[in-house]
Amino acid sequence: MGAAARSLPLAFCLLLLGTLLPRADACSCSPVHPQQAFCNADIVIRAKAVNKKEVDSGNDIYGNPIKRIQYEIKQIKMFKGPDQDIEFIYTAPAAAVCGVSLDIGGKKEYLIAGKAEGNGNMHITLCDFIVPWDTLSATQKKSLNHRYQMGCECKITRCPMIPCYISSPDECLWMDWVTEKNINGHQAKFFACIKRSDGSCAWYRGAAPPKQEFLDIEDP
């Protein structure tokens, strides 16, 4: 067998390996409950993107310019963040490096959670909670005003498979993936993990504020 023929199996194996291994530059995020996303974010707003452009954001260690996408936004409401309105949001230029793509033109409203930058602007990635406003449930919209904040001292633990358990009283077990094979299930859409008067945490469902009896250890 010639050298060229012997090299074919090796080339095929290398090609197959390249297709099976995850790309190093892919964006990978762990699922989080909307309440966790709210609590982890510096800024949470309802807004529209009206324009976008590519901008330079300094240089890397080799002197090459760092490109980012700048979205000019119209803020509708701030649920968490600084006193002044957010005017610009920045993100990476491609989804492979966790860049976010927003519809521009000011017609589509979003809930946008992200990190604050020192200049009063905001930075977002695909790992942040960014969804069209009209896809949120009524409970999620109401929870943004106060409910989620009530549970920021609680820990929401995602259950990837049965069995799964909580390890402390301040945890709520997030079961959507097990029960519905969907991280945007009933617990994500209709429940918040609320801290009660004894320091424990429990799931609470409903658009109305939690009753005092619930906070004083009523079974949810």
Swiss-Prot record:
Binding-site positions, Zn(2+): 27
Domain NTR: from-to ranges: 27-152
Listed Pfam families: TIMP
A GO-annotated cellular component: extracellular space
Name recorded for this polypeptide: Metalloproteinase inhibitor 2
Species the sequence originates in: Bos taurus (Bovine)
Subcellular location: Secreted
Disulphide bonds in the chain: 27-98, 29-127, 39-152, 154-201, 159-164, 172-193
Family the UniProt entry places it in: Belongs to the protease inhibitor I35 (TIMP) family.
Alphabetical keyword list: Disulfide bond, Metal-binding, Metalloenzyme inhibitor, Metalloprotease inhibitor, Protease inhibitor, Secreted, Signal, Zinc
